[in-house]
Amino acid sequence: MVKVEDDVEGSGINASVGDLRDAAVNPQPALLRATVKEEEGQPSSSSSHVRSQFIGMGFSPMLVDRVLQKHGDRDSDTILEALLSQSALQKSGSESGSLGDLFDSDNEENSSHFAPRKEVIQDIKVEADSSSEKRSYLLSTMNFSQREVDLALNQLGEEASLEQLVDFIVTGQVSGCSGGNENGDASNEVKDESLFGVMDKTLHLLQMGFTEEEVSSVIDKAGPEATVLELADTIFARRIASSIEQKEVKVEPDFLDETETSYSAYHPSNSGLRYYDDDHDNIRIKRAKHMFIDDSAGSSSRAGNQPNLDPWLKDHRATTSDGSVKEEFDAMTPGIRRNVRSDVANPPYFLYGNVVEIPKATWRQLSEFLYNVEPEFVNSQFFSALSRKEGYIHNLPTEGRRNLVPRSPMTIEEAFPFTRQCWPSWDTRKQLNSVATEVAGIEQLCERLGKMVRDSGGYLSQEKKTHIMHQCKLANLIWVGPDRLSPLDPQQVERILGYPRKHTNLFGLNPQDRIEAMRYSFQTDTLGYLLSVLKDLYPDGLRVLSIYSGIGGAAIALHRLGIPLQCVVSVDQSDTNRKILRRWWSNTEQKGQLRQINTIWKLKINVLEDLVKEFGGFDIIIGGNFSSCKGGTTVNSSMGMDSNQFFEYVRVVQRVKHIMGRLQVRAHESARHRHRSPSN
């Protein structure tokens, strides 16, 4: 009999009046909002978004403030018309060939010469077909420099549209030139070198998913000499600080097993990063690194005299400074981790998996929050037809691993045999790159590429072949005819990721939503390889606590391994994800119990203790990439990684390990007492 309990409405785990009161007193970090105090002469907090939007379009902050004071912030069309009108009037006053004068936002008169980005792009009347025509248009009509045009074409490719090229150049100019032309023409060469370095870094940061406003602000603050990694870390730090900096850590005494005196020298105001917990009896503030139970036994040698240095910024000095964003993994095949302490290696096991490519420096910081266990990197191409770099932090044994049987297809041809008849020999792809979710313009792209093949008359130049392959890799297009390309449909994505057929096929869920639900999902063959060691350790079944379960990748991997699931407590805020997992649980006739919880914020200390008591503990705590399956509104939704949610996963791991460790000690003492009693 399958017993499924859904805690979305409070069943399974009772929600008390006290819990509701706690939620009101201690709002969730995701719900925190900064209070903006209105000052005379400045736009109100309600207009800050509108102000940022128009400044991001390239208008002078002073001009935007003046227009907002005159017209208010409710009618965007009126504001835009006023800005364009005043910009046009000011622009006709004088012309300046200096980039410094052109973009000096502190000088209202000079800043008015800058045509807003939207206006510049709208002025493009033609779509040049060849790179030479685009180059000529950018140089003669748009008056960009030769070096700006060369850099844009090199970075975006000759097939990029004029709009994309103009947007790239203008973004670099806005980010890199905030000062005046104070040094005269003698410094132009130096400024040009700095400009193109800034433009290159700007492109990298935009490709990483950061907003233009974030990129422009961080470059202006950190300076053009900062590396891409340093700039990215700074943006991450700002995002983290804005979402959780004002939350206090509430830690009960037995959590840390430390005395009161160990806190006496600590000042809350010095804490750069704070955490949230739920004990109201003993409230203390402590640095984030001390949230771990046995911190003194850790192998990290990091000094503790840097309370104001955000953990996401540490160690960036040791990284390369060449501006490179993509860092290759040392070993892309699974390897043995070297520094799992004996006490950490004991159950309950934990596994945190991240399928989003992030810098090594960030991985180092993540591992420090999980007992300094080194991450294990793997490429899913060794287990499937998906080539994706993944990382896992876990304390699982590594001996006795095995592949899932039957294995998922290892190549595109194995996954989709129908492509054999139409796959061109010059398309050498064997595997797909990622779960592409972008659908805007995909049909037009397929039609354009197909027309390129048809018009070639059977002969494609190497340049066109390279271009077609590049577009196919970006959008994960496959050949469905001699001159026809198509994106993957949801069932094909399910097959690549190792999920059952029609796993995400819910009533009312369109194909795009189905693919979006799989965007950050585990590849079950890859995950199953790491989890396979549990089969011999737990022949009678596993008790699983699954954090950010997504569409159930961890449970499916264990099921494919043939490991019985005694219970799965699944935490995921997406109603779609919960329905998908619940239907799979029922369809596979699982004998255990599924308990679904709709938010990690419900896993308070007393709730975790009740769950451990109810199920007798957990054998493994699995965490993955957070995804709301609604487009996301979290601070790092574009990357699929929410730092705040990761810290909550760490909190749960630490709490569960401590609760179970405490119960084991009590059980041992009780057994010893019973053993001695008969002899007394």
Curated annotation (Swiss-Prot):
Its main location: nucleus. Involved in de novo DNA methylation. Involved in RNA-directed DNA methylation (RdDM). GO terms for cellular component: nucleus. Belongs to the class I-like SAM-binding methyltransferase superfamily. DRM-methyltransferase family. Residues 1-24, 91-113 are annotated as: Disordered. Keywords: DNA-binding, Methyltransferase, Nucleus, Repeat, S-adenosyl-L-methionine, Transferase. InterPro entries: SAM-dependent_MTases_sf, SAM_MeTfrase_DRM. The gene is DRM3. This is Probable inactive DNA (cytosine-5)-methyltransferase DRM3. It is found in: Nucleus. Signal peptide: none annotated. It comes from Oryza sativa subsp. japonica. Residues 45-86, 194-235 form the UBA domain. One of its GO terms (molecular function) is DNA binding. Residues 336-663 form the SAM-dependent MTase DRM-type domain. GO terms for biological process: methylation.
